[in-house]
Design a protein with these regions (language model features):
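DUTPase catalytic domain/fold
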Residues: 1-193
Length: 193
């Protein structure tokens, strides 16, 4: 029996704007054009990011039998022989039951056709990440392997599916209660420090 255990939401506009500026900086460092197009002034950048934010759609399953919720890119981008990775602030977070996590995996078609993968191979979004300093903002870092597609560039349009989120349950060890746990305060990657 399938249970309803989670709810996708958008992060605040302010969080999305902060993370988009970081992603734009990273993309330009690896040779990409600005994710903000020809916007130059702060006001133009805010307006461009507001448009992206307003168009973010919450993840959905394509069919009744689909396990994955399609996560879409909020902006256009290109990956090719020169630009091999990108950080994508999705604008999303996920509130879920304590004994679940959200697994983030690449869309299989993009993996087969373009060698697209997540930089960390699989994303794990813990249930307590929802309350992190960055509002639990789910971000995908995608990498592109041109040798797998004969150098064909991957051109992604805003709204195109880039990854999938799959809700999974997990167990704990019998002696787990003996280990002192920390409370999550940081954002992305903060519990491994």
């Amino acid at each position: 029996m399938v249970r309803e255990v989670a709810k996708f939401e958008k992060v605040s506009f302010e969080q999305f704007l902060t993370d988009m500026k970081e992603a734009d900086y990273y993309y330009k460092q690896v040779g990409g054009q600005s994710l903000f197009g020809d916007a130059e002034s702060d006001a133009e950048i805010v307006a461009k990011v507001r448009e992206m934010y307003d168009n973010i759609k919450l993840p959905t399953r394509a069919t009744d039998g689909s396990a994955g919720y399609d996560i879409r890119s909020p902006f256009d981008f290109v990956l090719n022989d020169k630009i091999k990775s990108i950080l994508i602030p999705t604008g999303l977070r996920c509130k879920m039951d304590k004994d679940f996590f959200l697994s983030i995996v690449p869309k299989s078609g993009l993996g087969f056709k373009y060698g697209l993968a997540l930089a960390n191979t699989i994303g794990v979004v813990d249930s307590d990440y929802y309350r992190a300093e960055n509002e639990g903002h789910i971000m995908d870092k995608l990498t592109y392997e041109s040798v797998l597609c004969n150098g064909k560039a991957l051109e992604v349009q805003a709204g195109m599916g880039i990854s999938q989120g799959i809700l999974l349950t997990y167990g704990i060890t019998i002696d787990d209660y003996k280990t002192e746990k920390q409370t999550r305060t940081g954002g992305f990657g903060s519990t491994g420090k």
